[in-house]
Amino acid sequence: MTDEIQRNSNDSLVGLYVYGSLVTGDFDKDRSDIDLLAVVDSDVDGDTFDRLDRMHARFVEDHPAWEDRIEVAYVPAPALWNFRTQTEQIAVVSPGEPFHLKAAGKDWLINWYMVREVGVTLCGPPPRALMPEISQSEFVEAVREQAEAWKEWVCKMRTPGAQSYAVLTLCRALYTDTHGKQASKKQAALWARAYLPQWAPLIQQSSLWLSESQDKEADDKAGLQETVRFVHDVAGRITGTGESASDASG
């Protein structure tokens, strides 16, 4: 894919980096996503956008097993360097979404921290040459802010697959808040089952939903209620608000 991105980006590619579970561990070749950051020297628009859009469509046609399992963020180099202070347009293809433009700024700090710390260079300079320093404390604070935001986002997680994603994401956020570093969803779930025994059945069920071929698209209202309680409980622990699960359900 590196050569394809280089060719279809009209030679604007500055660097390409892979991160996520493929790098940090617990990658499942049949189910896990591949996360890529493509740094480009200018905005992705016009002909470049159209070429990349067609390239990603062809890739799925040629490799159907990877449908909805590739995430690439195309980020102009100035936008990456100034992400703390400026919100700029980037191009993204991600699971469940077509190739599209979106605004990105400080809300992408978690991604850029992981690229900077553990990203593997596929082409171009090391990622640290293209983005400013990001401290561990900044990373942990961003995870805490995202955990708080999940109290609102979780209400939209109506299918078992989405609910499982929410549960495991909050497990990972709690692990990061406790240990100051990132873990894979699998590692964080195993840890959280012991750390939060009252939630162990839900965490185990969520892990199974994401690892087995089941119908993840049917609405699950009962599951949503329990997931909402879990998210509010864990987010409260992370942010120090101390909101109980019963508060969330009421």
Where are the language model's segments positioned?
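Helical scaffold of the NTase/Pol beta-like nucleotidyltransferase catalytic core
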Residues: M1-Y17, D47-F49, G242
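Structured mid-to-C-terminal alpha-helical surface segments
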Residues: K181-G250
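Extended, basic/helix-rich recognition subdomains
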Residues: E148-Q205
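Charged catalytic carboxylate motif
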Residues: R51, T169, E226, F230
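Short, well-ordered alpha-helical packing segments
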Residues: T2, Q6, D53-V60
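Conserved NTP/Mg2+-binding pocket subregion across the NTase superfamily
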Residues: A57-P160, S164-V167
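Catalytic metal-binding acidic patch
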Residues: V18-H56, R69-Y74
